[in-house]
Regions:
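Alpha-helical cap/lid subdomain in secreted, periplasmic
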Residues: 3-167
């Protein structure tokens, strides 16, 4: 699709957001919200220690995802070459992932009761939010950054979005 488009248009930049789905990010978020809604504040069930969540962040999986991202970026470069572009004739921009939630202390609503979910729209335990911001997101973004380096694509840029929603 990119190659076909680039053949008939003057493409100067390709922006890529990649990797989150390979860490099953949506399933992780779903687990965190489910654990928040299904456990009381006096006995919270955290998602960060669920086996299904932890499996996404093993060193083996991190390395595999990093390699997949690198290969996808190389495919982008090859598509541009096939469309007739010199490597210096376009720029690859790879986005890191923004944090969709604050750290635990940054929530507007208490984690006791359901107002954090029903009013605030973000049912996460503080510990899970801290884990997401302090471990999961840096791991995902580290894999993205590493894959850009591993790809060796000259002139590739990284657009750092991790803190884009802060404040």
């Amino acid at each position: 699709m990119l190659q076909t488009f680039a053949t008939s248009h003057n493409v100067r930049m390709v922006v890529v957001s990649i990797g989150g789905n390979d860490f099953n990010f949506a399933s992780v978020v779903q687990s965190c919200v489910t654990d928040f809604l299904a456990s009381p504040s006096w006995w919270p069930d955290y998602c960060y220690d669920d086996a299904s969540v932890k499996a996404n962040f093993t060193s083996t999986n991190i390395a595999a995802v990093r390699a997949k991202i690198k290969n996808a970026l190389l495919n982008v470069r090859q598509a541009m070459r096939n469309a007739g572009y010199a490597d210096a004739g376009w720029t690859l921009v790879v986005q890191t992932y923004p944090s969709p939630i604050p750290a635990g202390a940054g929530f507007r609503y208490s984690q006791s009761g359901y107002t954090r979910q029903s009013t605030g729209g973000c049912g996460f335990w503080n510990k899970d939010a801290d884990w997401a911001n302090g471990t999961a997101l840096p791991t995902i973004n580290g894999a993205v950054r590493g894959a850009v380096i591993d790809s060796g694509i000259a002139g590739a840029k990284i657009l750092e979005l991790q803190s884009a929603f802060n404040g």
